[in-house]
Regions:
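Viral structural modules
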Residues: 1-176
Length: 176
């Protein structure tokens, strides 16, 4: 005969991922001639629940290196860009995410592409991919068997004579 028990544990109760391609613009003090480089550093983010979705707030610093004055001088634009992304998270269970822990992972680091010069404005695209795991309480049912195998009991027939014999055979000066 068996019965079932429930174990309450933490597990991944929802997952999702999303690819983002966003357009941004920055202004330069002078009209750039050529874009020499674009890189992203200091990517920071955190996730939280909003309704049935997960929202990721984040920011990164973008550095755009450009030349100007007919490619005779260079300069770098440094700017912090903030973002707010909404990600739909799928769950096989009918659960409430409000008391859950949100784990955000970067599946593709933000990268800069398609950089164009429009007067003294530099337009560019940022691509990134984020993955979300929602960790919360869930229950696992396990089968527990009531029938246990009987343990075989061994009776040690140790007499006082046997114990005294063991004590006499022990050499206390074995290290010498």
């Amino acid at each position: 005969m068996s019965n079932y028990k429930e174990i309450v544990t933490k597990a991944v109760i929802g997952k999702g991922k999303k690819y983002f391609k966003n357009k941004y613009s920055v202004k330069s003090e002078v009209v750039p001639s050529t874009i020499l480089g674009c890189w992203i550093i200091n990517h920071k983010f955190k996730g939280y629940v909003q309704g049935d979705d997960v929202v990721v707030d984040g920011s990164f610093d973008i550095n755009i290196w450009y030349s100007y004055d007919n490619d005779t001088k260079t300069n770098v634009i440094n700017e912090t860009i903030k973002y707010n992304e909404l990600i739909n998270v799928k769950s096989k269970l009918d659960v409430d995410f409000n008391d859950s822990e949100i784990i955000v992972r970067v599946l593709k680091q933000p990268s800069c592409g398609n950089v164009q010069i429009n007067g003294n404005t530099i337009d560019f695209d940022i691509e990134k991919e984020l993955g979300i795991e929602v960790v919360g309480d869930t229950k696992v049912k396990i089968m527990v068997e009531d029938d246990e195998d009987k343990w075989e009991v061994f009776d040690d027939n140790v007499t006082d004579e046997t114990l005294e014999e063991i004590d006499n055979e022990v050499n206390e000066n074995f290290l010498e």
